[in-house]
Amino acid sequence: MNETDHKHITVLLHEAVDGLAIKPNGIYIDGTFGRGGHSRLILSRLATNGRLIAIDRDPCAIAEANTISDARFQIIHTAFSAIPEVCESLGLMGKIDGILLDLGVSSPQLDDAERGFSFMRDGPLDMRMDTTKGLSAAEWLAQVSIEDLAWVLKTFGEERFAKRIAQAVVSYNKTNSEKITRTLQLAKIIADAVPFKDKHKHPATRSFQAIRIFINRELDELEKALTNALRVLAPEGRLSIISFHSLEDRMVKQFMKKNSKGEVVPKGLPILEAELNKNIPLNIIGKAIMPSEAEIVANARSRSAVLRIAAKR
């Protein structure tokens, strides 16, 4: 595979970092280092006493981060759901001026056939973001029931043919001595099971997304990170979160809305609305931001990105 296959264009780079409203001497967390696009821009805006803690669970991302030689920067190999534990260990609970999360799978992960994320490239069916932990997709599919697989495809992929696909996958693994172990092998089984093809979308798109989300517990990770964000952030600390599919974006949107919504004071009550709502934890900053047409032309994978920004009060 040549180097251009692994070229990574950071999505909503300036918009996401602008959303952090960087204080030159602030302390920031990039919870999804990836290939370092956001981290490098954050560092360029920090003064000598600023600090950036980057987190990623992908060993390849850790290797990339280790090429950055900067006293203001440190990389930690863990999932972003562990941000509270990281802050506790560093004595930074409630002192973080901003957290950036760029959710989902990165272009290098998709383009590296050996990682098993892509239904367009043949490779081992792995799909783990952290290849040192947990079951691979192939190992899980070898033991899953039709009911459980159908639930995963429906819940995390919103796949209308979930039951058909689950039956085809489980049946193949039960009737063949050689199990499903390759990405293109799984993609073909899924395509053959789907009765109606969408000419704009590969029939395996939703299933691969669903299996990846399940294997990596992506929504659980996001829920934990959101739940603990308010404990971690300093007053006026920013949350800048990019999501790439409706399940993630819905969670982020609902979290921000729930924590920024005040109560309406019934007429006649001797209490001011401002007094009642002084403990609202978040302010939503602006509207959701989508990539420009120019960015989508330059990087088609940015098309589904949504950036939401909020600030702790």
From Swiss-Prot:
Gene3D superfamilies listed in its UniProt record: Putative methyltransferase TM0872, insert domain, Vaccinia Virus protein VP39
Catalytic activity, reaction form: cytidine(1402) in 16S rRNA + S-adenosyl-L-methionine = N(4)-methylcytidine(1402) in 16S rRNA + S-adenosyl-L-homocysteine + H(+)
Gene Ontology terms: cellular component: cytoplasm
Subcellular localization: Cytoplasm
Organism domain of life: Bacteria
The keyword Transferase belongs to this UniProt entry's keyword annotation: yes
Record keywords, A-Z: Cytoplasm, Methyltransferase, rRNA processing, S-adenosyl-L-methionine, Transferase
Pfam family, one: Methyltransf_5
GO biological process: rRNA base methylation
Binding site for S-adenosyl-L-methionine: G36, G37, H38, D56, F80, D102, Q109
Protein's UniProt keywords contain Hydrolase: no
GO molecular function, one term: rRNA (cytosine-N4-)-methyltransferase activity
InterPro entries for the chain: RsmH, SAM-dep_MeTrfase_MraW_recog, SAM-dependent_MTases_sf
EC number(s) on file: 2.1.1.199
Chief place of localization: cytoplasm
Stated role: Specifically methylates the N4 position of cytidine in position 1402 (C1402) of 16S rRNA.
Family statement drawn from the similarity comment of this UniProt entry: Belongs to the methyltransferase superfamily. RsmH family.
Protein name per UniProt: Ribosomal RNA small subunit methyltransferase H
Source species: Haemophilus ducreyi (strain 35000HP / ATCC 700724)
